């Protein structure tokens, strides 16, 4: 039997801690800067991000996992087991330094060849879904080599599709992560752009008008039409202060559309700094062939 492959991801993946523990996923902290304080993502509630903005008028900024964050974890793993194998399924490399930090962390290390890095080209729950799917693949393929696992992960990441709709555009504008920020108009007009994660970038696509609960059903159908989502599992993204009408609408519509398993995942502090309160999102697996 091949040596067990250990999965590593950043806390920005929003993988719930109990799920990470169950699947054996090690989470590396990303960071949130509020004033002169730098806090580890996952150590405080995302509602604090919103409270800070309400109190100061400033949106907290984020930073990726550092070389030290990765190296300290990698060193600890290989001290316990020099033959360990690690597959780092990284937060989108075009949005943060985490992937590069991981590369530098293994540079000149004797265990370098026992670590593989895959850019998931996803953030938040998109990354969560991809990492969870890779964990399931590894369970079904216990004798897979590290290279085989990395190839499988790349395919899974390509099939994974994510979008979200922010309620308040101020966070997304301030965060500077949206690649076509000029498309971010509409707060006063009740226009809400759908942000899709495309090749690792946050891209503002179709705009929806009206209240979040009303447009949730329409977005689900549009997203399914575009990606031909597989029916075995769909993820919905819940953020601080999201309207419960959104949850009801998506649960009801997903059931009618034949989705067998519905999982709600709450965003952590990193993506809350960019998407803000009241947002919601959808993550699914495309049944279309991916280039």
Which residue ranges define each predicted feature?
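Glycine-rich phosphate- or other oxyanion-binding loops that anchor nucleotides, phosphorylated ligands
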Residues: 56-101, 150, 157-160
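Intrinsic-disorder/low-complexity regions
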Residues: 80, 112-113
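Short beta-strand/turn micro-motifs composed of small residues
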Residues: 9, 90, 238
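N-terminal glycine-rich anion-binding loop in soluble enzyme alpha/beta folds
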Residues: 6-71
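Mixed-charge interfacial surface used for oligomerization/domain docking
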Residues: 3-4, 12-33, 75, 85, ...
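Non-transmembrane, interaction-prone segments in cytosolic or luminal domains
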Residues: 51-54, 60, 80, 214, ...
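Short beta-strand->loop
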Residues: 90-92, 118-121
């Amino acid at each position: 039997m091949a040596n067990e492959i250990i999965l590593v991801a950043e806390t920005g993946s929003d993988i719930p801690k109990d799920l990470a523990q169950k699947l054996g996923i090690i989470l590396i902290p990303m960071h949130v800067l509020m004033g002169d304080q730098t806090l580890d993502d996952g150590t405080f509630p995302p509602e604090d991000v919103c409270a800070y903005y309400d109190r100061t008028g400033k949106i907290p900024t984020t930073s990726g996992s550092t070389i030290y964050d990765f190296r300290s974890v990698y060193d600890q793993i290989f001290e316990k087991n020099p033959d360990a194998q690690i597959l780092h399924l990284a937060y989108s490399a075009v949005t943060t330094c985490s992937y590069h930090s991981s590369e530098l962390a293994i540079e000149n290390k004797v265990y370098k060849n026992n670590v593989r890095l895959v850019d998931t080209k996803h953030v938040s729950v998109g990354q969560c879904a991809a990492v969870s799917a890779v964990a399931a693949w590894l369970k079904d393929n216990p004798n897979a080599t590290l290279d085989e696992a990395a190839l499988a992960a790349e395919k899974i990441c390509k099939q994974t599709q994510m979008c979200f709709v922010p309620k308040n555009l101020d966070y997304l504008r301030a965060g500077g992560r949206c690649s076509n920020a000029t498309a971010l108009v509409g707060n006063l007009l009740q226009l809400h752009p759908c942000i899709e994660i495309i090749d690792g970038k946050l891209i503002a696509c179709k705009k929806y008008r009206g209240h979040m609960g009303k447009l949730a059903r329409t977005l689900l159908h549009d997203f399914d039409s575009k990606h031909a989502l597989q029916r075995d599992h769909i993820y919905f993204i819940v953020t601080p202060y999201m309207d419960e009408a959104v949850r009801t609408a998506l649960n009801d519509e997903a059931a009618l559309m034949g989705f067998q398993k519905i999982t709600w995942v709450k965003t952590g502090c990193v993506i809350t700094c960019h998407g803000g309160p009241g947002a919601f999102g959808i993550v699914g697996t495309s049944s279309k062939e991916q280039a």
